[in-house]
């Protein structure tokens, strides 16, 4: 079953709510850790064990259940600790995850937390740590009642134009990055599943903001994407059951490149 993460605690809280220790480098500012683009690096100003803290402004906000640190970071093999607390001093922190990291995309489940303060701690002093995003959000996935229609696709986008001139010379133009698109149709959507896709459309439809998408096949890496269209809100059955109608929803997404 596919899954989606579009909530982003740091982006919602804003740049002023983020504290990096050691402080962020002037040339790699902290806002890049929450801008949602994933590849524009934020960097600590000195080589030291480091923390990234988000003050969400209040407790009881939407839970965080997943963390993403996109590929391109220099964290390497560390034991990164994610914690939350109801006060900024972290006198009684709750550990949400301890992650043995590696190169490439870091994705890990978190113990659900609605506490006000979130902290990511990176040990070691070998480097001034840098990363493209500290994305802590809520994972949402359709229930087992939803059917993913066969034939979903993840093809590369056509990004090259080839021209042949009268002289016989041939030239090509690359239009944008090497991106993939995802087209997926889901049927028997109702109840909380219908709410999920309505929320998704409201938050991300028309490429308003990027989101992480886990494809139906676990072998496909989780990908940061734009939701370009959500359509085909079509009733599945001509004679719906007494519990109410179900719907078919079609998603069209394109890979987001930072």
Tell where the protein language model's regions lie, with residue ranges.
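Extracellular/virion structural assembly segments
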Residues: 1-51, 57-63, 68-79, 87-88, ...
């Amino acid at each position: 079953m596919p899954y989606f993460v579009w909530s982003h605690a740091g982006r919602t809280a804003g740049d002023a709510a983020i504290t990096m220790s050691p402080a962020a480098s002037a040339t790699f500012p902290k806002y890049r850790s929450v801008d949602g683009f994933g590849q524009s690096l934020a960097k600590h100003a000195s080589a030291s064990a480091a923390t990234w803290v988000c003050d969400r402004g209040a407790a009881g906000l939407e839970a965080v259940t997943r963390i993403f640190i996109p590929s391109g970071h220099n964290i390497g093999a560390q034991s990164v600790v994610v914690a939350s607390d109801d006060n900024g001093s972290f006198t009684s922190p709750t550990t949400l995850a301890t992650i043995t990291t590696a190169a490439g995309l870091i994705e890990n489940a978190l113990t659900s937390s609605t506490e006000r303060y979130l902290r990511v701690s990176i040990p070691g002093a070998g480097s001034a740590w840098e990363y493209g995003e500290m994305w802590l959000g809520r994972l949402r996935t359709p229930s087992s009642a939803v059917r993913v229609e066969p034939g979903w696709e993840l093809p590369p986008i056509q990004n090259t134009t080839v021209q042949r001139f009268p002289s016989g010379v041939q030239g090509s133009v690359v239009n944008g990055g090497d991106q993939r698109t995802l087209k997926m149709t889901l049927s028997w959507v109702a109840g909380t599943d219908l709410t999920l896709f309505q929320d998704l459309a409201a938050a991300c439809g028309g490429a308003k903001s990027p989101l992480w998408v886990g494809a139906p096949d676990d072998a496909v890496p989780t990908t940061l994407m734009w939701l370009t269209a959500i359509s085909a809100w079509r009733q599945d059955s001509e004679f719906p059951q007494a519990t109410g109608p179900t719907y078919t929803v079609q998603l069209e997404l394109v890979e987001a490149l930072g």
